């Protein structure tokens, strides 16, 4: 067996790194819970103007979830979600700054959350649809 030349070694090393770089993001994406993404819905508090809500959920490297809430109609964005859990298609989150909570169930194709939004003593049905 002939020893590898420096150029051959560099070529093999480059190919190995390219392959690893293409596989690792796919593996990370597979591990992310299906609720990770951007979700949008409309609160309809009967007799009051409708309020659009956008929820952003991301996964940390340790597997924990983080999120923020935007209220586009009020020009408010980035309200922190302080507690968020996802288990067996059930999502629960709470936002202390917004004084709200949401409990929803993810549908089978991972495109819609159907649930209940609670805020300020009011409970409203809220469907969140995946936008990203």
Question: Model-predicted segments: where are they?
Answer:
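Central antiparallel beta-sheet cores of small beta-barrel/beta-sandwich binding domains
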Residues: 30-130
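Boundary at the C-terminal end of the N-terminal hydrophobic targeting segment
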Residues: 21, 27-31
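Bacterial N-terminal signal peptides
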Residues: 10-22
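N-terminal secretory signal peptides that target proteins for export/translocation
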Residues: 1-7
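Compositionally biased, intrinsically disordered low-complexity segments enriched
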Residues: 7-8, 14, 54, 121
């Amino acid at each position: 067996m002939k020893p590898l030349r420096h150029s051959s070694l560099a070529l093999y090393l480059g190919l190995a790194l390219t392959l690893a770089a293409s596989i690792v993001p796919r593996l990370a994406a597979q591990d992310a819970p299906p609720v990770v993404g951007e979700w949008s819905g409309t609160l309809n508090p009967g007799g009051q103007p409708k309020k659009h809500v956008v929820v952003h959920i991301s996964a940390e490297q340790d597997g924990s979830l983080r999120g923020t809430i935007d209220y586009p109609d009020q020009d408010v964005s980035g309200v922190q979600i302080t507690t968020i859990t996802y288990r067996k298609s059930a999502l629960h989150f709470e936002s202390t700054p917004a004084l709200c909570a949401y409990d929803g169930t993810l549908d089978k194709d991972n495109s819609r959350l159907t649930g209940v939004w609670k805020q300020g003593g009011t409970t409203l049905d809220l469907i969140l649809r995946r936008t990203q």
